[in-house]
Regions:
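Active-site neighborhood of glycoside hydrolase catalytic domains
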Residues: 1-119, 123, 127-144
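Glycan-recognition and catalytic regions of carbohydrate-active enzymes
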Residues: 133-180
């Protein structure tokens, strides 16, 4: 970031869990390994935020495993899962929103599950911080125009989506549809 000061965004992507669950330094305190790991991570993040206080950072949480309220001191948002299938994201986002507000969650429109319409994929991603991971050149003109309008609508509705009250009406776990 020092070499490229124009960087506008930082993603902490750490999808590998600790696999060798032993530390020769902890000796009889092996049960402290995960706690000490997180404390060490936060020390690293303290240094990054001290050096780059205005740099937005996203935590890629690998399925929610590293999302916690302490992390919000450092990260502006969480990426809850690399699974961007919009049907699966309904379940992921439903569960994530039980603990964290919409403004902390990112969801992107992708090409996963092309059997669903661009409208459905966009509607699901608009439930939180909307993004697109999709090649515009691969989209039909009508889908592209729809996305342009959807972004305009999202920007208009963003204060309600990110800061409004969320009411859960129908769980995706109890039926073949959901509503929030």
């Amino acid at each position: 970031m020092t070499k490229y000061p124009g960087i506008a965004f930082f993603k902490w992507d750490c999808n590998s869990p600790i696999t060798n669950i032993y530390s020769m330094y902890l000796k009889e305190n092996q049960s402290h390994l995960y706690i000490d790991y997180v404390r060490g991570l936060y020390k690293v993040l303290d240094r990054i935020k001290a050096k780059y206080p205005d740099l937005p950072m996203m935590l890629c949480s690998g399925g929610g495993g590293r999302s916690d309220y302490e992390a919000l001191k450092y990260f502006t948002e969480f990426w809850p899962s690399d699974n961007t299938d919009p049907i699966e994201r309904l379940f992921i986002q439903w569960g994530f929103s039980q603990v964290f507000p919409s403004k902390t969650l990112c969801a992107h429109v992708t090409t996963w599950n092309r059997g669903t319409s661009i409208k459905f994929r966009t509607d699901v991603a608009m439930m939180c911080k909307l993004g697109f991971d999709i090649k515009l050149d691969d989209m039909s003109q009508s889908d592209h125009l729809y996305c342009v309008q959807a972004v305009k609508n999202y920007n208009r509705l963003k204060p309600v989506i990110l800061d409004g009250d969320l009411y859960r009406l129908v769980s995706p776990y109890g039926s073949n549809h959901t509503s929030s």
